[in-house]
């Protein structure tokens, strides 16, 4: 899969990056390469009932939860909105949901406010967390390809996800809310 050009492309990828960064090619010591689909989202369908866009589920959840946090009125508590990376590969990276980032940050906030470690543990016990994601609905043209038990339908309300291995934070209380 060509990422920069075909075999006949002139120059190196790192030369182009170095020029853009204003450094020498040999000054690039390492890299992380992120590829993004830059196609704009589109609304389509006979009644414009469908939205197609890259990363739609993650961005939709991030946006709507941030809007909810901003709209909320809570002067007694510290409200936190966390958007993590690497959910598609198991969340086990240092910036993923299984990392210590949130725990460490909340502890530092508590300690910075002059609270004790016990106060931090109490605040965690009183906290309410939501893990937001989209559920993939049954494709109307290929219903046989869908999960035989869990069958979300388009525009039929929210889906509450459970996982036997507790990979979601759904429990009786969060499901009831």
Feature locations, PLM:
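N-terminal hydrophobic/helix-forming segments and targeting peptides
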Residues: 1-177
